[in-house]
């Protein structure tokens, strides 16, 4: 799947949202690098958010703002910890999931957003996880297994 997405990036084909789940940093870093190098310096703005420290609203506000000096924006939303199983009230940051779910159905066409969940797995029972997976290209960043 990564090879297909990387090829699409190189051919100028981009979906509005990507979700990368998994602990293999090579695939995460390489996906971001290939996406970034698919544009020239003046064609794209790169903005990064840490969702363990910043609310989703920051990502959505940035995504809905038209790029000023470029054609597109790439937003990297790292550490999407709200996608994993946690006890209620244990999240450090409160996120507006209703707004997020509405935004997922109508994302900006000038922004490519990559949500990174660097965890072994996400909580498939959560509504927000289901919505994000339905409205994104999902990539599994797993360590390749040697098959003999």
Predicted segments with their positions:
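Conserved beta/loop motifs at nucleotide-recognition and modification sites
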Residues: 1-148
